[in-house]
């Protein structure tokens, strides 16, 4: 009888080799999520830079939106396709552009290109956080938190225009273009009086307040265990023990408010919960606007204001402002509709 002693060699296929290469430790981690993140982010950023550099919006909005036409960083944009394109994905090889790059630019094909690649790159970045957290045996709360800005992006740039007549009514990708969209949201949807917007504002501003308070409190209660009390010199960045006193911080805020967080887990969960919930509420509200759901209507005040010239509230004043936005903006914003309004309904200075 012959006994062969040898070392067992595990059979490794193509998938194992690719997995090893993708997940190898390197300066910039790639991972499986990188197969989605890096190409999509490259395409989205490249499309935006291309559009803002030399692509006009004359054929879709009657506007100049590129550096070549005289715009600057704040006024340049990749604008939405023409209203006649409805919800077409506007593929370069599709029936609209028929493979003609110049025609594709003129029709607004860069906008769905940037929007869809941008959405998938954000999703890829969230999956990247999941993947790295899993490899380091961490909880996935970073990825869960990042779902909030993804929800806002998808709801504003994709779901809202899907509920409207076409991509034309989505925000264009530019600073001044986003400001115009905010005014549009207010005038046509009374967005500031929407309870979901209120929850979003409370979440974002509340998170900023919590962040400032938390950072200041930690700085206030740092241990002076190095070569001086200087924040940037007193501590070894690799020391194992904590560098601030939770007990002292608890005592301080108990004296200030009468209540304070008693443990770090609840404190940091609250700092996670407030902004994420606020952004998710905003996203839900925008989905409602896609379906043209209305905000609060205080009809009794409107009726009384119409009957009594001396009765006016901030609400009725805002309703008049919204009407002015709609009357003025509709003709400016949708030139293809050739909208005309009688002179008496158009806003004139401060007299609405």
Swiss-Prot record:
Q: Which residues cross the membrane?
A: 40-60, 124-140, 152-165, 207-227, 278-294
Modification N-acetylthreonine, positions:
2
The GO terms describing molecular function are:
chlorophyll binding; electron transporter, transferring electrons within the cyclic electron transport pathway of photosynthesis activity; iron ion binding; oxygen evolving activity
Any other noteworthy remark? 2 of the reaction center chlorophylls (ChlD1 and ChlD2) are entirely coordinated by water.
Please explain the role this protein plays, according to its UniProt record. Answer: Photosystem II (PSII) is a light-driven water:plastoquinone oxidoreductase that uses light energy to abstract electrons from H(2)O, generating O(2) and a proton gradient subsequently used for ATP formation. It consists of a core antenna complex that captures photons, and an electron transfer chain that converts photonic excitation into a charge separation. The D1/D2 (PsbA/PsbD) reaction center heterodimer binds P680, the primary electron donor of PSII as well as several subsequent electron acceptors. D2 is needed for assembly of a stable PSII complex.
* Swiss-Prot/TrEMBL catalytic activity: 2 a plastoquinone + 4 hnu + 2 H2O = 2 a plastoquinol + O2
The note describing how and how many cofactors are bound reads: The D1/D2 heterodimer binds P680, chlorophylls that are the primary electron donor of PSII, and subsequent electron acceptors. It shares a non-heme iron and each subunit binds pheophytin, quinone, additional chlorophylls, carotenoids and lipids. There is also a Cl(-1) ion associated with D1 and D2, which is required for oxygen evolution. The PSII complex binds additional chlorophylls, carotenoids and specific lipids.
Q: Which domain of life is it from?
A: Eukaryota
Organism the protein comes from = Stigeoclonium helveticum
What is its membrane topology?
Multi-pass membrane protein
Q: Name one Pfam family in it.
A: Photo_RC
Entry protein name: Photosystem II D2 protein
Gene that encodes it: psbD
**Binding positions for chlorophyll a PD2?**
197
List the keywords (alphabetical): Acetylation, Chlorophyll, Chloroplast, Chromophore, Electron transport, Iron, Magnesium, Membrane, Metal-binding, Oxidoreductase, Phosphoprotein, Photosynthesis, Photosystem II, Plastid, Thylakoid, Transmembrane, Transmembrane helix, Transport
Say which family it is in. Answer: Belongs to the reaction center PufL/M/PsbA/D family.
